[in-house]
């Protein structure tokens, strides 16, 4: 189950936390959440600085009502924070037991390699998964990212596998969402 701190301002994590408490045990499922986008106003409200990562993991764990995440995914690469700072902070979360594994999302293959190189060079935790935009309408990841992940034995977990709903209906059908969704209008029309 993948949620993110920013989805519905944390409500997705709260709903999942309640569902897990009522219907399953954390040991029976794999829980993943993402970090990057702003959760409040302020200079440290977003991104992948050490301060932002540490603040958001505590909030995520509180909302999920658990002591750890199985997989903590960076929602985007933060180009305003040094990669070394981000990778060290993520490694420290693993060392602290708050996170079992780390993953990445939505970056270029060369950026992903750079993150992995920095982690390996310093003996830190490396990413075990890559989540990029991929579906029957948008297949760019087949060019570089997928071959890289296969070679490095990194799990691939696509997002928007139904192209924001475009693959669930006849091509060209308009919905209220498709009229206003920037991602749909950018990638799938």
Question: Whereabouts are the PLM-identified features?
Answer:
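Short, acidic/polar
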Residues: 46-65, 112-117
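Active-site mouth loops of central-metabolism enzymes
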Residues: 39-54, 75-81
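Beta/alpha (TIM)-barrel catalytic core signal, keyed to glycine-rich beta->alpha loops juxtaposed to Asp/Glu
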Residues: 83-189
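N-terminal binding-site loop/beta-alpha segment at the start of enzyme catalytic domains
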Residues: 2-30, 67, 95
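Active-site groove signature of glycoside hydrolases
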Residues: 61-82
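A short, structured active-site edge motif that brings together acidic residues
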Residues: 27-40, 130-132
